[in-house]
Structures are given as structure tokens and as C-alpha cells.
């Protein structure tokens, strides 16, 4: 395969790769990971700040990624027999007051509506009308267990109505004090599944099914390896009996909780009155579950796959998997180039990858070809194809794989390929990019979970910015003993992430108490 070496690469030192490379971003990951993250969001045109504190505008490319997440996950949700529905944004305060642990867990984050009308005051400013105060305050949805529970209490009468499984795609509001786009915002988009069951075993099976759905989605679709496990008692969802999570390792070694699944026992059912008549004529409380994931996954994709040139978007969630950039020069050759590109676009769209038609964009915008190329590099389009007059004459295309942007020399890795050969291999190339991104992230995760740590303070202190996670053995203490451990970890800016479901059995003493350990728990810094 013949290489095309671009001359527009002006060298400067690359911390990561060694060769002299001019990267597309002004901030590198190693120099300032937090600033790099914000730079990727801006340069990849994913989102921007809005005029509302803690709320963001998700731009078309970012929302396109969310739509891809919705499309694939919605199919998985429906395959499990779950139906979509929609429930109110406003929830009466009394609904929350029925479940004390639940309201305590969310009280500090709740946005409250108290009036239903505005009037002009003596200075002409709009203020709430004192005569329009609501009889009962309404909470702007932080999560929907209470309002969906109220509906379930009407829908469930008999054992024949169970299991009842619903999901909604919606926005939620949690008044975050320290916000960061896609990771912590006062308003975010998500899906939340809610189910009711006749007994604990069926509800637990659903809880673990949802967890496995999230694990599979993260790894197979987002190319983001995760650890699935149960949350310690102090990290449980408010009011839950058990909470499970998937935890992903970002490139700075911090953990990102990317999805959760909760077994709620009968507490929420009792508060909402979700009862059913069993086969013998008796009445029992339902066992309920809830599970959800959100636009936070996009933040995870950025910090798992992004590089110093922007986002690298896994093909399965890329709004456009292949972008064709015609190299036009406002002359007589342009018509032939566009015809050549349209034929290429048509033939690529006829292909399937990952069981779906290949998503192709022919970029005919007014920007110069070089500007378009680097714009798509920063957005993370998996494959960028450039076509100029020489390519038309030779029956070729110039192909850039976003996961292999540079040659070993540090020059842009743009390769001449025969047009027919590129089309024949396009679907396989997309699948190879997906696998390559996952393998890279998997290697990083596996290499940075330490299982030999005996002193957390020593391990997580010092100058090293990247320390990954520690998997340690513990006795699963409760009450005051657990509270003291949480405070010790907090002083080190650490948290317990989860107890991995596939971890080796405990065979030593608890790192915190010295008592015989019963399981292993992941410790790390987190977003």
C-alpha cells in the first residue's frame, strides 16, 4: 500500500508518541487532563455551555452520538421485554416523603416549583405571583421511582400483571454544585428502567440482567471495558437494598460510573402501594428494580478513546462512520471529483457493518479540504476519505483511519487505496477500528489494577498522576466501622467503586480492619 505523506505537518514534541508531531489540540492529556477534556468537547463540536448554570447545549455531533446510544440500547431494552413509556417531569413532594431514605438521598439536589404564574412588580420586573402559590410543591424529576411506582400501583392487580417492565427516555434535574459537561450537569438526558416482580429472585434476576446489558453495551458498542460489581452499602442508591454498577477506567486513572442497576426490595412498593393478588388469593407487595444510564457515557467515550488530536469515536456510535472529503479547487476538475465521490458514497451506503447500513457523509461544505479533514479528525470520524484529481485519474482514494492517525515517523497516515479495494474492505475496516479501540482500552485497564497494595495512603500519594485502581480484600464492615473507613478514604480523595462480580475469592485479611476478608473491593479516585 502506497503512503501519501502530507507536507502540512509542522513538527513539535509529542509527549505520547515520541516523534515530532503537530497535534490538533492546544492542550495535551499529560499536560492538563481536565483542560484537555474541555478542549475535546469544544474542538469536536460536541457541546457548549448555556446561559443556565450547570446546563449544557448538546450540539448536533454530540447529540448524534447520543442518538446512536439510544438506538442500540433501546433495541436491547425492548429485546428484554421492556416497553417504553413517559411519566411526568413534575412530581409531588408528598410522593418523595413516603420513602424517607430516598428523599434524604436527593434532598440537596432537588429543584422545586412553588408557583404557577408570574406577575410584574411595581418596577416592572417579573416575580412569582403570591396568589399563584401551589398547594403542594412540585419536584422537577431527579429520578422517577416514586411517580412510576404510583402508576404501577394502578396497573398491577394480580399475579397475571407481573412482571411489569417499563422504560423511559427523559431528562432529569439534579442541582449539582460542581458541574462538568457530560459528567456532572444540573440537567442531563438518560434512560431509566423500572420493573415490578412477584418475588425477590425474579427481581434480582432482572437487576443483574440490566447490569449485564450495560456491561455488554459499554464493551461491545462503546468499546469501553468495564468492571461490573456490587456497590458497598455507603454507595447504594437511596432506598435500595442492593446497587450494582459498571466502572470504567479513564486515561487519567480515575473511575467513571457508567451505569447502575438497583434491587429495591419491597420498600418502594410499600410506599407506593404496589400489591398483587397471588394464585392463592392472598395479597403481597411487589419487589421492584430500577436501572439507568445517561449522557455521562459520552464523557466516558471522550476520556477512554480521545487523544491529543480530539475524539476518536467508536464506529458503532459514530453518527457518520465514513466521511468523504472532495478536494475541490473551483476549477473544471471539480465536477468529475464530485461525481466520483457521489458514486463512492452510494456504493458505501449499500454496505452493512455491525448489522446496520454503513453511515456515510459526503462533505460538500464550503470550507477548504484541509480544514474539513482536521475538523473530522477532531470529531473522531472513524474513516476519512479524501478525493482529489489525481485520485480520480488513478481510480484511488486517500484513506485516513482515525485510530491510526500517524505513521511511526510522526507524519499523517494517509494511504492511497484502489477505490474498489477500499469499498470491498470498508465494513471490515470499521469492525477492525472498533476492536482496536477496545483492545487499547482493555490493555490499559488490565495493566492498571493493582492487587498487591497493602498501604493505600502510600500507593495513592506521591507525584504520579496516574495510579489507576487498587483491588483489595475487605471484611465488608457496616455501621460505624464502615463510616470510619469511608472517612479514611475521603481524606485520601478515594472511594470504593464496587466489589467485582468476577473477582477471585478473598483469601486474606481485610486491609482496613485486619479481620478475615469476605470479598474484594476496587478503590480509586473517581469522577
From Swiss-Prot:
PROSITE patterns associated with the record: AA_TRNA_LIGASE_II
Reactions listed under catalytic activity: tRNA(Pro) + L-proline + ATP = L-prolyl-tRNA(Pro) + AMP + diphosphate
Alphabetical UniProt keywords: Aminoacyl-tRNA synthetase, ATP-binding, Cytoplasm, Ligase, Nucleotide-binding, Protein biosynthesis
A GO biological process held by the record: prolyl-tRNA aminoacylation
Superkingdom field: Bacteria
GO-annotated molecular function: ATP binding; proline-tRNA ligase activity
Residues annotated as signal peptide: none
Record-listed E.C. numbers: 6.1.1.15
Keyword Plastid assigned: no
Record localization: Cytoplasm
This protein's GO CC annotations: aminoacyl-tRNA synthetase multienzyme complex; cytoplasm
SUPFAM superfamilies in the cross-refs: C-terminal domain of ProRS (SSF64586), Class II aaRS ABD-related (SSF52954), Class II aaRS and biotin synthetases (SSF55681)
Pfam families named in the record: HGTP_anticodon, tRNA-synt_2b
Family from the record: Belongs to the class-II aminoacyl-tRNA synthetase family. ProS type 3 subfamily.
Domain free text: Consists of three domains: the N-terminal catalytic domain, the anticodon-binding domain and the C-terminal extension.
Function: Catalyzes the attachment of proline to tRNA(Pro) in a two-step reaction: proline is first activated by ATP to form Pro-AMP and then transferred to the acceptor end of tRNA(Pro).
Subunit structure comment from the entry: Homodimer.
Record-given protein name: Proline--tRNA ligase
Organism: Sphingopyxis alaskensis (strain DSM 13593 / LMG 18877 / RB2256) (Sphingomonas alaskensis)
Gene that encodes the chain: proS
